[in-house]
Amino acid sequence: MESLKSPVFLLILHLLEGVLSESLIQLNNNGYEGIVIAIDHDVPEDEALIQHIKDMVTQASPYLFEATGKRFYFKNVAILIPESWKAKPEYTRPKLETFKNADVLVSTTSPLGNDEPYTEHIGACGEKGIRIHLTPDFLAGKKLTQYGPQDRTFVHEWAHFRWGVFNEYNNDEKFYLSKGKPQAVRCSAAITGKNQVRRCQGGSCITNGKCVIDRVTGLYKDNCVFVPDPHQNEKASIMFNQNINSVVEFCTEKNHNQEAPNDQNQRCNLRSTWEVIQESEDFKQTTPMTAQPPAPTFSLLQIGQRIVCLVLDKSGSMLNDDRLNRMNQASRLFLLQTVEQGSWVGMVTFDSAAYVQSELKQLNSGADRDLLIKHLPTVSAGGTSICSGLRTAFTVIKKKYPTDGSEIVLLTDGEDNTISSCFDLVKQSGAIIHTVALGPAAAKELEQLSKMTGGLQTYSSDQVQNNGLVDAFAALSSGNAAIAQHSIQLESRGVNLQNNQWMNGSVIVDSSVGKDTLFLITWTTHPPTIFIWDPSGVEQNGFILDTTTKVAYLQVPGTAKVGFWKYSIQASSQTLTLTVTSRAASATLPPITVTPVVNKNTGKFPSPVTVYASIRQGASPILRASVTALIESVNGKTVTLELLDNGAGADATKNDGVYSRFFTAFDANGRYSVKIWALGGVTSDRQRAAPPKNRAMYIDGWIEDGEVRMNPPRPETSYVQDKQLCFSRTSSGGSFVATNVPAAAPIPDLFPPCQITDLKASIQGQNLVNLTWTAPGDDYDHGRASNYIIRMSTSIVDLRDHFNTSLQVNTTGLIPKEASSEEIFEFELGGNTFGNGTDIFIAIQAVDKSNLKSEISNIARVSVFIPAQEPPIPEDSTPPCPDISINSTIPGIHVLKIMWKWLGEMQVTLGLH
């Protein structure tokens, strides 16, 4: 049975939780409502695909229900259908559902370049993911032998997405040493199976007998895989291998394998997946059901033309700080460039009342855009009635279309204590409201409108040189348009000039963009002198000046030349800003994009806000970019953060194209804006991107009628960056609100060093331990810690639970380096304390100058393994064997490096990744 409308207007308050995910999902009486599964623009029309999606969710719901102790099930799902597909009577217009906030994206290829199911997740353990990626072939059941049934795999990915748990297998190293014996990485450890040698040639693999232990390393030799037995008694764990028939549960505290070197142990402090799920808000607000849940219902929604109404404040306070004119400058950019061709746009202004400046007009030409620009307000007076503006905008939209799925861009600088009176109307409208708070006095309730409708919330101060207002409007591309239609910001900068000074610089137009390129310049008093040259040195003419609005713009015809576009702008005693935007040069070549994310839209001091920027070209991550966040407070103070992709501090995974940093420099309560700058340069070497962490398990093989059968080799995406990258991007990251910041200066130091997450250990000889890690800071990942506490134990659980009483290592002479630096430290184990086969676990805690301590680091592990002696070789035998060097990397727990010389000299090195 299908419901014709998606009840998205009910899915409101959950959006207050945070913004790592823009999901509309709400948990209502144990059922997940508002799930959005979007079929990407590149997927050819295929009605069977819709049925495949329905079948997967319908079959997954009871599996999820039983796996979670009768707590959760899938209640209703909206399937978002591309505009290019043929319209049908059962397809209705979306409300708040967009491709941008989709929970599941169905695309012809996954971000891995193949059919592997995968979940985007950039946050910490327990934080929600961004979205799940599936392919049509996977949904059609064409990958059953590689990934297992679609419904079970979907529940596996749902756990990544909704509860922030991680895989309990290891795709890179499938075995580890425990008490001197090799064990398959699995959870629970009660899962039984065969250790088989897999031989692959071309596109097929066969089994080649039982695995053999390497007498030097203690691990199995290369090409050994663990193949689970078909009949098991163990019910866990879904995050290990949900394809095993008996597996219907998550690992719990009782059966969790804490020693296994997997991401769940590494990222979640050895906790089981069920322990993490139990700490989620979902779990806390539910109790087990006593009856079976109903089957999911589905709504089929088809994307249509974009419908936008500008709702602009022209009250008396807009005279302050030239706000009315600045609003018109930013609105001009939106109308000229940001809003996509073919969109319908209207305009309403408001003070104490509201006024229709333009009914909905379709933008099919430059003349259509210019006509709307002429309706921008020129006079400001009166009070502020935000609800009047919204009601009038709904009326304007309803004259042409239903308000479902329409958008409102609401800008205001004033207080309005009646704004909550139209909240119900907004919820019922099905419209998405983007809010722009201008200046320090904008209504504090303003963000509620964007939060309850899934819109973008932005903030601009009156510091004109930061160009925040233009950035806010530049960020308002459609959440449903294909990326090739999006306006992409290449540059945004401003400067205060004196005495005929110049603003000089260059903008990079890379090969992925160049269409509809626009240079927009604003000033505050008199028109400046403007020079722009293309990469060939040809001066550009054709600037259009509007001295009333104090803006000039140049639209580059055709596709802009690739290279450096230079500019020189001269002025005196005023502020200039420059904004450059463009679009994809080709519909077939994805443009390089920057997607900013903050982990919360309300930050309560002293909890830090985490700023992320994902830089990609299509599905491929962009590495080694220079990425900076500019964060501006309500006081006008700006803080510049270098975002890093180093796998330390706020950054979860090294070299995945996601750049991260903690923000702790709060100076006041109120709004903070976020802006990202990204610059790519020449790469001097081939840099390999890290594979995504939350991939579905590829099944190496299975047992059928007592025989082991092997799958073809796992499809691998190299993600090798082997070309020069030269690009520039700017993007607004929206805004967040800080609360609980102390009013009195100086603000107390309440921020400890961040957790060390990349501790690695190795042992040389029989007693020299080498440690490496990335230095934390005094305040999370900023500054310099004061000292380190290093402790060790032969019990991984004791070290975690009783760190303060574990054996402490002498760290005399260890002086912490600046945050993000590499730390190296060596210490000796005492005498013959640890015998052969002993596992030694090591962890670090950082301490700052206020004696605030970080969380305990990830736990590094070394194992003392002494190979059996070979019988002596007679003197008349062949010459001694040459040196042997063996390296085996085990991400998540240990790096094993063994060097053995025939003369009896031995080095055993084990360390943690």
UniProtKB/Swiss-Prot annotation:
The molecular function terms in GO held by this entry are: chloride channel activity; intracellularly calcium-gated chloride channel activity; metal ion binding; metallopeptidase activity
**Post-translational modification as stated in the protein's UniProt record:** The 110 kDa translation product is autoproteolytically cleaved by the metalloprotease domain in the endoplasmic reticulum into a 75 kDa N-terminal and a 35 kDa C-terminal products that remain physically associated with each other. The cleavage is necessary for calcium-activated chloride channel (CaCC) activation activity. Glycosylated.
Metalloprotease domain: annotated span: 46-199
Give me any GO biological process, just one.
proteolysis
Q: Domain VWFA: where? A: 307-476
Q: What is its EC number?
A: 3.4.-.-
What positions are marked as the site Cleavage? R695, A696
Coiled coil: which residue ranges?
none
What causes induction of this gene? By IL3, IL4 and IL9 in the lung. Increases in the bronchiolar epithelium of asbestos-induced fibrogenesis. Decreases in cystic fibrosis knockout mice.
Q: Cite the active-site annotation.
A: E157
- InterPro entries linked to this entry: CLCA_chordata, CLCA_N, CLCR, Ig-like_fold, VWF_A, vWFA_dom_sf
Q: Which residues are glycosylated?
A: N504, N770, N804, N810, N836, N887
The entry's keywords: Autocatalytic cleavage, Calcium, Calcium transport, Chloride, Glycoprotein, Hydrolase, Ion transport, Metal-binding, Metalloprotease, Protease, Secreted, Signal, Transport, Zinc
Q: Where is the signal peptide?
A: 1-21
This protein's record includes keyword Ion transport: yes
User: Which Pfam family, giving just one, matches this sequence?
Assistant: VWA_2
About its domains, the entry says: The metalloprotease region is responsible for autoproteolytic processing. It can also cross-cleave other CLCA substrates.
Functionally, this protein is described as follows: May be involved in mediating calcium-activated chloride conductance. May play critical roles in goblet cell metaplasia, mucus hypersecretion, cystic fibrosis and AHR. May be involved in the regulation of mucus production and/or secretion by goblet cells. Involved in the regulation of tissue inflammation in the innate immune response. May play a role as a tumor suppressor. Induces MUC5AC.
Q: NCBIfam families recorded for this chain? A: choice_anch_X, hCaCC
Q: What is this protein called?
A: Calcium-activated chloride channel regulator 1
What organism is this sequence from?
A: Mus musculus
Q: What is the lineage of its organism?
A: Eukaryota, Metazoa, Chordata, Craniata, Vertebrata
